[in-house]
Curated annotation (Swiss-Prot):
Assembly mode: Heterodimer of an alpha and a beta chain.
Source organism (scientific name): Saccharophagus degradans (strain 2-40 / ATCC 43961 / DSM 17024)
Full protein name: Integration host factor subunit alpha
A GO term for molecular function: DNA binding
GO-annotated cellular components: cytosol
Amino acid sequence: MSTSLTKADLAEKLYEELGFNKREAKELVEHFFEEIRNSLEDNEQVKLSGFGNFDLRDKKQRPGRNPKTGEEIPITARRVVTFRPGQKLKARVEAYAGTKS
């Protein structure tokens, strides 16, 4: 089973490696993600150099199907957040592909 990196883990890393106190580290992580959320709410692209880009994309309404009944139902139009990894992130992930289980 794979593990997940959480916001609490990020705050702990800031505490251990950069010397922030635990409260400051938690606030920094929360503020970082709040800024990303605010930018996306304001229809702005979020570009994190060396990591990737968060974009908003509008999806049109389309036909769908209820898997239990087979009944056709419309899937409403909506806005979604997409993430496109940057070249550096892609290269690092590809370099480690298949080395961990």
